[in-house]
Amino acid sequence: MKISMINYKSLLALLFILASWIIFTVFQNSTKVWSALNLSISLHYWNNSTKSLFPKTPLISLKPLTETELRIKEIIEKLDQQIPPRPFTHVNTTTSATHSTATILNPRDTYCRGDQLHILLEVRDHLGRRKQYGGDFLRARMSSPALMAGASGKVTDFNNGTYLVSFTLFWEGQVSLSLLLIHPSEGVSALWSARNQGYDRVIFTGQFVNGTSQVHSECGLILNTNAELCQYLDNRDQEGFYCVRPQHMPCAALTHMYSKNKKVSYLSKQEKSLFERSNVGVEIMEKFNTISVSKCNKETVAMKEKCKFGMTSTIPSGHVWRNTWNPVSCSLATVKMKECLRGKLIYLMGDSTIRQWMEYFKASINTLKSVDLHESGKLQHQLAVDLDRNINIQWQKYCYPLIGSMTYSVKEMEYLTRAIDRTGGEKNTVIVISLGQHFRPFPIDVFIRRALNVHKAIQHLLLRSPDTMVIIKTENIREMYNDAERFSDFHGYIQYLIIKDIFQDLSVSIIDAWDITIAYGTNNVHPPQHVVGNQINILLNYIC
């Protein structure tokens, strides 16, 4: 017994010495230990974010979420609540345009210009059964093709299978009404779930050049590989892009990029059937006759004030008449472009839809001269000047993700936040930003983060140069039957709502290209010149 006690005490002494040594070692190397923990958790976070920025099972983190991450989380949670899961066992249980019923409330033989026309929509499935929930992606439009007139309608979802569709009768004549079921609520739910599951619908290929050697390598926002990666990071804004590092090639040798769609889908076979051409954009009001709208001897409409920077927008924001855009809340004057732009420095930042503006300016102002910036490719930065009038207009693309089958240079690419940061700004400086189309194939957190970072950069710009005019151009609607999982207008509509929400607290103006292109009925990511010209006319009224 005595020997056992001695052995027990000896064991305790040894354990105490061992514990003391471990504590001493950790204390001496605490910085290294915590750095290692931080690094592993950071890599774990980035490498496991392919399903969602904020997974169902939260990761254990030693660092609290940043303000940006908290805001992203908040926005995604709100969207998740608005787009609940809608599983279905058969297509017959999804919304049917044919079986749904639309009824004009308080119908009349003739309506008066300026009246509100309301339609009650009750949606049913393909078996004719009344649906008990909403969430369908609908598009309402009124038009008079002979008058080259059009406007969007407002859709109110009561979340019980009924909707109120409201039209403002802006003009006289015979008016056609349209209500399209773009996607049933089950399709909306499937698109939302699929979007946030993967970053690999688009494959990026980077070209690395070192002397006479040229190598191509896989790149992307997230790469699920154990290979060594080149990391192109903006640590401040927490944005990144990655390429598999080529052998015997430095990461700085990346010069060009192109992309293509990958044969991958996160939709089930049953879900895919909802996005076949015959099931997308189906007319609900096909049997409706045109309605007649008259002046009705109403008093002359009061003159509206001229459109100016900072005005708020309504829904709908205006209408097309004789192919010309007419806002609801103000009137657009005819502006002489050359004189309006005299002494102005115009920055056009974004995708190819804002590059259309650049091309329009160059085609419309014969005194603008293009400056060779010694770049190559379709997406090269553009600069045009009129030295006599001191006009300077430039377009630059934004940083990843930038989708394009044609090879483009990345040597001059930068995040828009950095371009805004180095802009001095003053009363004759105008910045127009367009984000959206290239983000549609990726999880929504990528777009939200970019929008928040741009918001912060604009906020800083307006603090140091409050006279700078910043205009946000929203997305155009695009082709309806083109690869819904990647490019559906549903994705664009969510981004449109996010933009309006994020930028509402800043002194910026929004050009509602979404509503404008619905009114024109273009269904083209690159609308025709007359539509682009009307978008630009809003800009000219804002800045002159």
Swiss-Prot record:
* Domain of life where this protein originates: Eukaryota
Q: Which residues are glycosylated?
A: N29, N38, N47, N48, N92, N160, N210
Keywords from the UniProt entry: Glycoprotein, Secreted, Signal
Bilayer-crossing regions? none
Q: Which GO terms describe its cellular component?
A: extracellular exosome
> Which cellular compartments is it found in?
Secreted
Identify the stretch annotated as signal peptide in this record: 1-27
**Similarity comment:** Belongs to the NXPE family.
- Protein name as annotated: NXPE family member 4
Provenance organism:
Homo sapiens (Human)
